[in-house]
Curated annotation (Swiss-Prot):
Claim: Transmembrane is one of the keywords in the record: yes
The protein's name: NAD(P)H-quinone oxidoreductase subunit 4L, chloroplastic
Transferase keyword on record: no
Superkingdom of the source species: Eukaryota
Keywords, sorted A to Z: Chloroplast, Membrane, NAD, NADP, Plastid, Plastoquinone, Quinone, Thylakoid, Translocase, Transmembrane, Transmembrane helix, Transport
Gene Ontology cellular component list: chloroplast thylakoid membrane; NADH dehydrogenase complex
Record note on quaternary structure: NDH is composed of at least 16 different subunits, 5 of which are encoded in the nucleus.
Compartments, record wording: Plastid, Chloroplast thylakoid membrane
Name of the encoding gene: ndhE
Protein family per UniProt: Belongs to the complex I subunit 4L family.
Molecular-function annotations in GO: oxidoreductase activity, acting on NAD(P)H, quinone or similar compound as acceptor; quinone binding
Record's function text: NDH shuttles electrons from NAD(P)H:plastoquinone, via FMN and iron-sulfur (Fe-S) centers, to quinones in the photosynthetic chain and possibly in a chloroplast respiratory chain. The immediate electron acceptor for the enzyme in this species is believed to be plastoquinone. Couples the redox reaction to proton translocation, and thus conserves the redox energy in a proton gradient.
Main location: plastid
Annotated catalysed reactions: a plastoquinone + NADH + (n+1) H(+)(in) = a plastoquinol + NAD(+) + n H(+)(out); a plastoquinone + NADPH + (n+1) H(+)(in) = a plastoquinol + NADP(+) + n H(+)(out)
Amino acid sequence: MMLEHVLVLSSYLLSIGIYGLITSRNMVRALMCLELILNAVNINFVTFSDLFDNRQLKGDIFSIFVIGIAAAEAAIGLAIISAIHRNRKSTRINQSNLLNK
């Protein structure tokens, strides 16, 4: 693939993720949109690592590190969402203000 195609794909993923994060009212959907944003960043890391640094794999290693951090973030986020759902019986963002009660 050419550089422009990969950058357009990454910008689409980033745009969809930011739009979904802003407009989402469900916590699980917001977490999925955050994962889309992180995947767009990973695509850029791998693309520019391949373009500028052919012999060293710094971008690839960094993207694997980001994938690991994103997996931990998703696990912790789902655990928090599960606890909120258990207490509040809802995963809607506007109904989960823990400072009210």
